[in-house]
Regions:
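Expand to "…catalyze enediolate/carbanion chemistry for C-C bond making/breaking, isomerization
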Residues: 1-241
Length: 241
């Protein structure tokens, strides 16, 4: 659902929910959001809570009625490690995707190297039958639970669990959070050279702190930086929020 909206240049509406907060999660389903971001950065990471949170995004009434056949709103997870820390925390990416998340939000995306490492860690090291996709897949093999959550066979999951728009038919989404002066400076190079970053989210709080204006998110300098991020994303055809 979310990727379909993005690839057709349609707005998508979502919200953050606390990992394990079933009231927040069920309300997000009932309110009709297009996606939800399960918060696992600042609120602590608990994979048992994440497993339960994902299950409560399955609206079985709508599934039985034939309206949908997967989790809706689309479940994304904001993980704890910053982009530069991902290489030493591969298990976080692996276990989050293995539970069936449809996408990841990655804090402090700042360099080309970190972005490419992220793309590689989210990609299986298998031959892609849909064309030449420039990614050295490093995702560990364990698709059984994710395939079950998606409601498909393992073969179908592996075929679909590729990164959009790197693979135009992919159903996984990486959203990089641009929230530092360094990230802003390197954003054009990241978006032009690493095609697996599907969208960008602005992090105004950390961005303000990085600019020496902690807590002053409405400062003109911070607002100008936010606008620059949006313009860069527009220039490179990458969805942003």
């Amino acid at each position: 659902r979310l990727i379909s909206l993005l690839e057709n240049d349609k707005p998508a509406f979502g919200t953050f929910v606390s990992n394990g907060s079933l009231d927040e999660i069920t309300e997000s389903v009932d309110l009709g959001f297009d996606f939800v971001i399960i918060e696992n950065e600042h609120a602590g990471m608990d994979f048992q809570d994440l497993r339960v949170s994902l299950q409560f995004l399955l609206d079985r009434r709508r599934i039985q009625a034939g309206e949908i056949n997967e989790a809706y709103p689309t479940p994304l997870v904001r993980v704890s490690p910053n982009a530069e820390e991902i290489s030493n925390n591969q298990w976080v990416i692996k276990q989050t995707l293995d539970l069936g998340a449809f996408g990841l939000l990655i804090p402090k995306l700042e360099t080309i190297e970190a972005a490419q490492q992220l793309v590689d860690l989210c990609s299986y090291p298998v031959e892609n039958v849909k064309g030449d996709i420039p990614s050295e897949g490093k995702r560990g093999w364990g698709p059984k639970r994710a395939a079950r959550y998606w409601g498909v066979s393992i073969a179908e999951y592996v075929k679909s669990a590729t990164l959009w728009p790197l693979d135009p038919q992919g159903e996984l989404l990486i959203i990089g959070i641009c929230e530092s002066a360094l990230g802003l400076r390197n954003l054009p190079d990241i978006l032009s050279q690493v095609k697996g970053i599907g969208a960008v989210l602005v992090g105004p709080g950390d961005l303000a702190a990085s600019l020496g204006l902690a807590g002053k998110m409405n400062h003109p300098t911070v607002e100008s930086a936010v606008m620059k991020i949006g313009q860069i994303c527009k220039d490179y055809g990458v969805p942003a929020a």
